[in-house]
């Protein structure tokens, strides 16, 4: 983990309130597993004391670049949306533990399920699975058509399905409605699933397909390094808690309570 002044190589809007930023820095050499995140300081850190945790969407170690995708939800991310190409930002990272890309072998099948701003970390995962010859089935959930992003990018790596709550594109409803449809058609055969999204989506996913998979939690975070215990969640098999920013954010679905 490093704290580094990095250069913004790109910062563009890709969907409603959603932006893609490319960051260049030496910390990228330490990025290894899909699902890790960075903590970005907002301005000089005086007006906005807490950094903003943003998942890493793509890793390019050859060019020392990472791509992050974020949504404007408050003053911090609004500030980020106004950062220009060539500006410097203070980045702490990489942080957390990501998905186990070695949990499947060649010719096995992975089911990737993302909801909203939980979609981005699955892109690097799909890319790495593709390189290893692992088939991927990808399901992406959004509220509406104007919030959809990266559908075409994911299609490069596997069968890709989109759901929207209002039915403006893809299957009307939730990611689990796509799953039910594929199950009814006997078109959903996979060895393990990998997911990231809001708590209701993760709960519904586990109810639909069981616990043999990975979930990435989106708990609110403060320090990002496990020191403040602001982002803990409860373990299933013992009366204990785990720090999402340090021990996660990716867990086996069978290991933690989804609350």
From Swiss-Prot:
Q: For [2Fe-2S] cluster, which residues are the binding ones?
A: 223, 228, 231, 245
Q: Which molecular-function annotation in GO is an example for this chain?
A: metal ion binding
Task: Check the record and name the SUPFAM superfamilies matching this protein.
Answer: Ferredoxin reductase-like, C-terminal NADP-linked domain (SSF52343), Riboflavin synthase domain-like (SSF63380)
State the Gene Ontology BP annotations.
'de novo' UMP biosynthetic process
Q: Which residues cross the membrane?
A: none
Concerning InterPro entries, the annotation shows: Cyt_c3_hydrogenase_gsu, Dihydroorotate_DH_ele_sf, Dihydroorotate_DH_Fe-S-bd, Dihydroorotate_DHASE_ETsu, FAD-bd_FR_type, FNR_nucleotide-bd, OxRdtase_FAD/NAD-bd, PyrK_electron_transfer
- In this chain, FAD is annotated as bound at 52-55, 69-71, 76-77
Cofactor(s) this protein requires: [2Fe-2S] cluster; FAD
Question: What is the cofactor note?
Answer: Binds 1 [2Fe-2S] cluster per subunit. Binds 1 FAD per subunit.
Question: Which domain of life, per UniProt?
Answer: Bacteria
Q: Which UniProt keywords apply?
A: 2Fe-2S, Electron transport, FAD, Flavoprotein, Iron, Iron-sulfur, Metal-binding, Pyrimidine biosynthesis, Transport
Q: Residues in domain FAD-binding FR-type? A: 1-101
Quick one: which pathway?
Pyrimidine metabolism; UMP biosynthesis via de novo pathway; orotate from (S)-dihydroorotate (NAD(+) route): step 1/1
Subunit-level organization: Heterotetramer of 2 PyrK and 2 PyrD type B subunits.
- Family assignment from sequence similarity: Belongs to the PyrK family.
Query: Main role?
Result: Responsible for channeling the electrons from the oxidation of dihydroorotate from the FMN redox center in the PyrD type B subunit to the ultimate electron acceptor NAD(+).
Protein name according to UniProt = Dihydroorotate dehydrogenase B (NAD(+)), electron transfer subunit
Name the gene that codes for it: pyrK
């Amino acid at each position: 983990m490093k704290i580094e002044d990095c250069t913004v190589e790109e910062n563009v809007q890709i969907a409603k309130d959603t932006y893609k930023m490319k960051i260049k820095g030496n910390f990228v050499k330490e990025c290894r597993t899909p699902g890790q995140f960075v903590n970005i300081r907002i301005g000089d850190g005086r007006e906005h004391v807490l950094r903003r945790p943003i998942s890493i969407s793509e890793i390019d170690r050859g060019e020392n670049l990472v791509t992050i995708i974020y949504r404007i939800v408050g003053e911090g991310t609004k500030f980020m949306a106004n950062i220009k190409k060539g500006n410097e930002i203070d980045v702490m990272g990489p942080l957390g533990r990501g998905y186990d890309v070695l949990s499947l072998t060649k010719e096995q099948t992975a089911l990737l399920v993302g909801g909203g701003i939980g979609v981005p970390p699955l892109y690097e995962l799909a890319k790495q699975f593709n390189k290893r010859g692992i088939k991927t089935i990808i399901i992406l959930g959004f509220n509406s058509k104007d919030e959809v992003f990266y559908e075409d990018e994911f299609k490069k790596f596997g069968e890709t399905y989109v759901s929207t709550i209002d039915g403006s594109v893809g299957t009307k409803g939730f990611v689990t409605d796509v799953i039910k449809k594929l199950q009814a058609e006997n078109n959903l055969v996979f060895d393990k699933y990998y997911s990231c999204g809001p708590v209701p989506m993760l709960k519904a996913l586990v109810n639909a397909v069981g616990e043999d998979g990975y979930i990435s939690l989106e708990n609110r975070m403060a320090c990002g390094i496990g020191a403040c215990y602001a982002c803990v969640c409860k373990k299933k098999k013992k009366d204990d808690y785990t720090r999402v920013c340090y021990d996660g954010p990716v867990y086996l679905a069978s290991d933690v309570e989804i609350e």
